[in-house]
Swiss-Prot record:
Primary site of residence: membrane
Localization annotation: Membrane
Protein name: Dideacetyl fusicoccin A C-19 hydroxylase
Binding residues annotated for heme, in chain numbering: 454
Amino acid sequence: MVVDDLHRLASSQFKLPVAPILFTALAATIGAFLLSSLRSYILYHRKMSLFPAPNSDSAFRSFFSSKARDKFLSNAQELIRQGFSQNKFAIRLKTDFTDVLLLSPRYLPQLRTEDRLQGGPYTVQELLGYLPGFEPFRFADQMPKFIPDVILTRMNRYLSNVPASITEEVEVNLAENWTDEKDWHSVHLHGTMLGLVGQCSIRTFLGPEMCRKKRWVDLHTEYTVAVVTAVQALRKWPRALVSIVQWFHPKAKAARALLNEARAMIQPMHEQRKRDMAAGKPVPADTLTWFEEVAKGQAYDAAVVQLTMALAGLHSSTDLLCAVMLNLSEHPDVVEALRQELVQVLKREGWKQTTFSQLTLMDSVLKESQRLKPVGRAFFKRVAVDNIKLDHGVEIPKGAFVAVSNHGMWDPHNYTDPDKFDAYRFARMSDNKSSAFSTVSVEHTGFGFGKNSCPGRNYVALQLKIILAHLLLKYEWRLPDNYTPATFNNGFDLIADPFAQVLVRRRLEAPEVSLRQNT
């Protein structure tokens, strides 16, 4: 007993107090973290301050004033011109969501395989993908290879089926929306083309039943419009308040409701498809099957995947189709040349996938329209996950939001008369592989560049050519008198006149060739 008491007494004399030690360690850890964060913050802003900023503003002023943001939204073109006149390598722009380091396209060869620049985090922040109802904008960050793998390893294998299936949807849609009326009548160009592209895409993604299900076709387009307009509305609020405001904002509430409706429609189909595949039953070759094959048991939200696909391609494809049609409405001689090319090639080759790769002039018109008005003034949007050194002394700090300017597509060093629509520009280069519509290059970045260029561009090219073939051989269209279409500028975004009405009528002559696949 005595020995034990002495042992306990001796031990107690040397026992250090636990609470002060933990407090000291915690304080030291927090202090080190804060010092490290402060150091990173200072280094980041020091590096970013080296670049010209044509619409710069202090953090304090930008919180209470929208002046810098408004300059960006209304006149990004002039800001970019001013910036690159001061520094031809890189500039800093205060956009409507953060500061962006905008690089010259000369850096594309260096950036094409750069793994320290990641696209997912940029999209999440720019398009508010962290909010409920906006999940399609964060899907690519959570599962970055999922959709590209499905497109490259599954969907592209079935492109030979596309001409026959899509032509059915084009016929149905145009008969309903453009009608067979042979007198001139007015239609809303963007609205009718959005529905047409959406129906054709759904036919490829989900098959004939869903693409004729009006509520899904409407929801498919309604959600993409609702969520994009919600993003635009919420970005007008201070960033710190967005997570609160979104619960009450009507546009954000509409996006959430539409996503929930999409889940109610897609989830039962997804569950049934999984059961059929597990039982070894025959299943259609569509995205429900392909995503399940690629997922290999990994959980995912099937409705979010479908809407992510829609957001990735629906608006950009529709916008390009509208741009082409507006350009052609001002060049009737090109319309006639396109018709002649179609008749000649279709008579020789028939209505099949390989035929459409031989439409040299149509390729040129699509590529030239995309060059003259891409979907944005910037692309290759990324976040730097580490410090990156580029040529000519340009250093990208860790955490920087980075994009590449598209001004190479309007550079007179790359193109003669770059501001002019030249339908034959790329047709004259047809012996050059880079002249094909779906080919990317440093000079033409309509589909991006490098390993992360659009994986679905071959499908997009085929889909748009099929639609144009129907429009050219079956219809005439023109602009109303005294109407000049205008490109809508909104920050980096460039949108073919979303308000344009066109006058259309069914051609008096029947199509000179069949727009159906020979059986």
